[in-house]
Amino acid sequence: MTTPTTAPSGCRSDLDSRYHRLCDLAEGWGIALETLAAVGAVATVACMFALVFLICKVQDSNKRKMLPAQFLFLLGVLGVFGLTFAFIIKLDGATGPTRFFLFGVLFAICFSCLLAHAFNLIKLVRGRKPLSWLVILSLAVGFSLVQDVIAIEYLVLTMNRTNVNVFSELPAPRRNEDFVMLLIYVLVLMVLTFFTSFLVFCGSFSGWKRHGFHICFTSFLSIAIWVAWIVLLLIPDIDRKWDDTILSTALVANGWVFLAFYILPEFRQLPRQRSPTDYPVEDAFCKPQLMKQSYGVENRAYSQEEITQGLEMGDTLYAPYSTHFQLQNHQKDFSIPRAQAPASPYNDYEGRKGDS
């Protein structure tokens, strides 16, 4: 006769043992992480509603084009917080495929959206025509679909179509190595996003560089989190019972990094008025162009004469309200004498008469 297992402190006696970490007071990390994940999920949903509300508040059309990709990004963040519960619950035939498939797919969605945003900012900061919202969204979805194909292929080959318990049956070192190898494409996306964001700082329209900083700093913190959990997961000296704790902590930490260092700063920029320093080249035709000031019709004959005589512009006097022809080298100027009437031949007529 088997004795029933006693429920840990804080859990009901009839609760399945797979869910004991959600309420076990002795293992407080499960309760702490599920609380942070739940709060993060609620905050993400609130951000999604706020994003829909801000659509009519965004005055800059170039910022409005990013809203569909940012909404997709929030869906990925919501999935990251939700996936945390799959790592708090013990590994079995249901949580195993969920972990291996969704971990890479959700992060691929997030980093693909950041990479598409960085590509659009590179054009804007250089004054070029920005990408349309459909192109930005297509880039984000296209980059993330690669990880979907990789994850599906791995699951089909590993489970042999029907064996869903294979992940719990694998040795822990082998399972961790496969898990990390499955995420190589996500690591490439993350590093590519980080280095691409540096190109946003090379441009004349400085108003867009703030958005590039949000992407750069978010990618940097994400890389630090990923390096930490990968190293901890692959160290053989650590007790394998902490694997789920390490992965669930990485999920919660990265989810809050996405919210705190990308979403919230971007939301602060959305309702702001359009600044002249943010104008791309497509608005250049609205700006007045400087024209060369001209004081008359140029005569190439006189211009050529000035060149042949070797006259300098410093010797030219400009007199306002005068004609185009100005006095040059005024020290050698001379006056033309007035015309005088010739003497009449009859002035000496009377004198000639007296002589005769």
Swiss-Prot record:
Subunit comment: Interacts (via its transmembrane domain) with EGFR.
Tissue: Expressed predominantly in normal fetal and adult lung. Almost undetectable or expressed at very low levels in other tissues.
GO molecular function: G protein-coupled receptor activity
A family per Pfam: 7tm_3
Phenotype of null mutants: Homozygous deficient mice developed more lung tumors during 1-2 years than heterozygous or wild-type mice.
Ranges facing Extracellular side: 1-35, 90-101, 153-178, 236-244
Transmembrane segments: 36-56, 69-89, 102-122, 132-152, 179-199, 215-235, 245-265
Principal subcellular localisation of the protein: membrane
GO cellular component entries: plasma membrane
Species in which this protein is naturally found: Mus musculus
Annotated glycosylation sites: N160
Induction context: By all-trans retinoic acid (ATRA).
UniProt record similarity statement: Belongs to the G-protein coupled receptor 3 family.
Protein name stated in the entry: Retinoic acid-induced protein 3
Residues with PTM Phosphotyrosine: Y318, Y321, Y346, Y349
Function, in words: Orphan receptor. Could be involved in modulating differentiation and maintaining homeostasis of epithelial cells. This retinoic acid-inducible GPCR provides evidence for a possible interaction between retinoid and G-protein signaling pathways. Functions as a negative modulator of EGFR signaling. Acts as a lung tumor suppressor.
Residues bearing the modification Phosphoserine: S303, S344
Region (Disordered): 336-356
Membrane topology: Multi-pass membrane protein
Superkingdom field: Eukaryota
Keyword set, alphabetical order: Cell membrane, G-protein coupled receptor, Glycoprotein, Membrane, Phosphoprotein, Receptor, Transducer, Transmembrane, Transmembrane helix, Tumor suppressor
Topological domain ranges for the Cytoplasmic compartment: 57-68, 123-131, 200-214, 266-356
UniProt GO BP: negative regulation of epidermal growth factor-activated receptor activity
